[in-house]
Amino acid sequence: SAFPIEKGISYCRVFSVFFPSYNRGYGNNFSLQLGAFVFGAVNLDQIPLVISGKFSLPKTTSIGILNTSFALGGMYVQIPFEFFDEDIGLGIAFGTDTFGNNFNHFSTSIGWGYTRYSGDWELDDDPLINIAGNFRFTDSIALIGEQWFIPDLDLDDSPLILSTRFIGRKFAVDFGGIMTLENIVEGILPFPIINFTYHPR
């Protein structure tokens, strides 16, 4: 979403076991994430490192469901030298528009991927689009969903993620799956995902 992490608030998150991250809010508008992609027992110099930042603009509208928030951000992934002979990185620059509040909201995001190869930067011509939503059934249960639209990929093959979030005082756990419309039609089971979030304070 376009919502910022509040000033001084931090949390640790593990996405599908492979992507642990530390997230923190600075000031009232800037959020920072530091993470890594960890696949099994590998050396530290073989782990792709991730840094991302998001600047949430001051809210412009605050009337019920029309409560609107905007954010601009970017993510960068440094690929280890072990994988390629050259210095390689990739990432995305994006903008997000969110309607609603922290409990129930709907977001649309558009972003352009980019790559860095031996010091040369290249921006993709076509954008990625993401539509996401969060619906809070109770104080402790929420439904989370997002649909990706990827250039040169048919809608039937685009990733769809659905999960149920169980929310505690300091912990939250997501159980869900990644699927495509084609998988659903063919009766193929979703790829399972499980996420953990811990709020120290």
Question: Which sequence ranges carry the predicted segments?
Answer:
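A mid-sequence, solvent-exposed acidic-amphipathic segment
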Residues: T108-L153
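Transmembrane beta-barrel domains of Gram-negative outer membranes and organellar outer membranes
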Residues: S1-F106, W112-Y117, W148-D152, D156-R201
